[in-house]
């Protein structure tokens, strides 16, 4: 899955499909590694940047481990930083009169002038940067004082916090009605075409009624 030859193949595939206006689905998130580790990181990052640069339409990334055979919540948190960095890279550089800030350069002047105290610097630093959420960015003394944590440690803390505190937004009544209508249409279709028997449908409805 993480072989560089696959990246070359997918890049060519994406460009041909873009030429003909065909959407693509690239499997960025499926490394050969069996657990969250260095191999998983470089295989995923390498695939993600190349499929992004070559114009892939849909590029699933988060959580995949060992091809398409397993999923790890911890890996998903680590992958979120890969996705963020690749996304920021693909956004590119904004070159405008405001970002060039020639008037500020003239105003501040040469040494000992600096730009650190300017609102313009703070504004564009925040927009241009991507701050990873699970990376170790401390100085060496800070790293020692914090317990020598690795990216795996930070990702595990973030994962546990998300699991403990996340509250998904509930569906509206209209959304629930729409979903039920779509499911009813699908059930009717599969029964009509013989893909679901009456006995299977009865067992399915009984399971729904019991809440299992």
Locations of regions flagged by a protein language model:
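Glycine-rich anion/phosphate-binding loop at the beta-strand->alpha-helix junction
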Residues: 1-82
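Catalytic-core signal marking the mid-to-C-terminal active-site face
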Residues: 74-212
């Amino acid at each position: 899955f993480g072989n560089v030859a696959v990246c070359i193949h997918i890049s060519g595939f994406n460009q041909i499909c873009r030429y003909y206006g065909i959407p693509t689905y690239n499997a960025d998130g499926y490394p050969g590694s069996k657990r969250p580790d260095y191999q998983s990181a470089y295989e995923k990052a390498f695939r993600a940047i190349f499929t992004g640069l070559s114009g892939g339409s849909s590029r699933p990334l988060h959580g995949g481990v060992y091809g398409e055979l397993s999923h790890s919540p911890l890996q998903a948190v680590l992958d979120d930083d890969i996705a963020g960095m690749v996304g920021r890279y693909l956004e590119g550089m904004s070159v405008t009169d405001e970002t060039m800030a020639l008037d500020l350069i003239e105003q501040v002047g040469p040494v000992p002038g600096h730009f650190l105290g300017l609102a313009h610097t703070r504004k564009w630093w925040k927009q241009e940067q991507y701050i990873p959420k699970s990376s170790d960015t401390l100085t060496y003394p800070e790293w020692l004082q914090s317990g020598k944590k690795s990216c795996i440690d930070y990702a595990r803390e973030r994962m546990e916090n998300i699991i403990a505190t996340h509250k998904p937004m509930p569906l509206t009544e209209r959304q629930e009605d729409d979903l039920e209508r779509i499911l009813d249409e699908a059930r009717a279709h599969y029964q009509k075409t013989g893909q679901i028997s009456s006995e299977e449908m009865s067992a399915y409805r009984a399971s729904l009624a019991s809440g299992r």
